[in-house]
Every structure is written in C-alpha cells, then in structure tokens.
A protein has these predicted regions:
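Sec-dependent bacterial lipoprotein signal peptides
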Residues: 1-21
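Lipid interaction determinants
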Residues: 21-83, 89-139
C-alpha cells in the first residue's frame, strides 16, 4: 500500500519541480492588438524600412482598423481601403491596403507584434532581411 502512495507523491513532486524550474506559465501572456487598434484612429509614428525612416512620407494619413477586418487610410479627404487581420497564434498583424502609393504600400506586410498598449502598437517584420519596424500611435 505504501509503495503506490510513495510513487504518486514522488511523481507529483517531480512535476511541480520541473514546472517551477522551467518557468512554465511565464511569458505566455499575450495581449491581442485587436481590442486596441479597433478603438479609434491611428497615425504612423515610426516606419523604418530597409534602414530608412519613412514616417514623414506618411504624415497626414490616419488609419482606422474596423472590427470587420477592413482598414481605411485617409489623407486630405482621399480614402484608401484595404484589409487587415490578426493571427493570435503567430502574434502578428497582416495589412493589405489597395494603393499604388509607394510609401503606403510599405505597410502592406505581415508584422510581428512587439508591444501593445492603449497609446501605441509596435510591430516588426523579421521575414525580410531589412527588419522593418512600424509603430502606430492613437490619436
């Protein structure tokens, strides 16, 4: 009778030990960007592509992320539509604006989510060699 109880206790101890030592549960909290970006209007605060800062070229554009997956960019009354989505498993946002504007098309990509808060969302593209960075700021 004592042997199964000792084995069970030993197994529980080992599981708890490995869980504590390996940090299971640490760093797994993921904050989705969707609840933040769908709360209003945003502007591009930082766009670094191929080592060049391009946010100035996008000055005046506002971005609205709709919960339906649509995105609208507006500057001087001109509306540019597109689609966006968030993949919570891969922790990334995909943006696809229907435009030929060479600077606005730089937003069309799959962006890894670096950080999310009420005022800023910081994204990074690690799929290409340039390591582009994008930060949008709430207006």
């Amino acid at each position: 009778m004592k042997s199964p109880l000792i084995i069970f206790t030993l197994k529980c101890f080992i599981i708890i030990y490995f869980a504590a030592c390996t940090g299971i549960g640490e760093g797994t909290a993921y904050k989705s960007a969707t609840p933040q970006v769908t709360k209003g209007v945003w502007k591009v605060n930082l766009l670094n592509a191929a080592g060049k800062e391009l946010a100035g070229e996008l000055a005046g554009y506002t971005l609205t992320f709709l919960p339906s997956g649509k995105i609208i960019a507006v500057r001087n009354g001109e509306l540019i539509r597109g689609n966006w989505s968030e993949d919570e498993i891969l922790k990334r946002i995909t943006i696809n604006l229907e435009t030929k504007d060479p600077y606005l098309t730089k937003l069309n990509d799959r962006w890894n989510i670096s950080s999310v808060n009420a005022k800023d969302v910081t994204l990074q593209n690690t799929e290409n060699s340039s390591g582009s960075r994008l930060q949008i700021t709430s207006l």
